[in-house]
Amino acid sequence: MMLCACAFTAHAQGNTSQTTDIKKSKKMLVVFFSRTGENYAVGNIEKGNTHIIAKMIAKETGSKLFQIETVKPYPDEYKACVDVAKTEKENNARPEVKSDIAVEDYDVIFLGFPNWWGDMPMAVYTFIEKHDWNGKTVVPFCTHEGSGLSGTERKLKDVCKGSTISKGLAVRGTTAQNSLSQARQSVEKWLKSVLQSK
C-alpha cells in the first residue's frame, strides 16, 4: 500500500473551507515535514516533494521556513519507510523531533506534509502538540500521488485548537519533482485565493 494511500476522501467543514484575509497579518511562517531517499513514483530524490513546495510558498509570501525533522531518521528504502509509517499511525505514535520554532510568535502558519496513509506523518502531530494554536490561521498543504489532502483539514481543526484552518493545497509529488512550472502555477493560484479578503 502506498504511503499516500487513504481510506477516504473528505472535505473539511466550517472554518476549513473559507478563505482568510491574511494580507494584514504581521508575521507568516512555513513549517513542513518532508522526506528524501527512495520515493514512490519519482525514485531516489535529494530534496523531498513537500520541501520543494514549501520553498515556493516561502518565496512567494516572504515567510520564514522551518523543517520538522525527526531524531530517528526514516528509512531511505521506500518499503521500509512505508512499514514504519504504518506502524506509527496504527500506534498513534509521536516520534521525537530534533528542533522547534515558536509558532506562537506568528500570525499565519503554512503547514506542509506528505500524505502518509491518508493522514499527516505522526511527527507532524508531535510538532503540533507542542504549541498553542489559539488565534492562529493555519494554511495546510500536502504532496501526494492521488489521495489529495484526505481528511487532514478536518484533523487540523481538531488538533490546532482555537485556530482557523484555511483552504488547503494538494500537489502531486511527481509534479513537484518533474514539473516545477506547473507546481509553481498551482502554488501561485492557491495563494491568490487564500490571501484574498473574505
Which residues does each predicted region cover?
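Bacterial Sec-dependent N-terminal signal peptides
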Residues: 1-14
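N-terminal beta1-alpha1-beta2 submodule of the flavodoxin-like/Rossmannoid cofactor-binding fold
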Residues: 11-106, 118, 185-198
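Structural signal for conserved beta-strand scaffold positions within catalytic alpha/beta enzyme cores
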Residues: 32, 67, 140, 167-170
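Solvent-exposed loop/turn segments at secondary-structure junctions
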Residues: 35-38, 70-75, 115-119, 144-149, ...
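Low-complexity, flexible helical/coil segments
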Residues: 62-69, 100-105, 144-152, 173-180
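Conserved beta-strand segments of alpha/beta enzyme cores
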Residues: 62-64, 164-167
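Helix-loop-strand module that forms the ligand-binding subsite of alpha/beta enzymes
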Residues: 77-164
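A charged, well-structured terminal subsegment
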Residues: 165-198
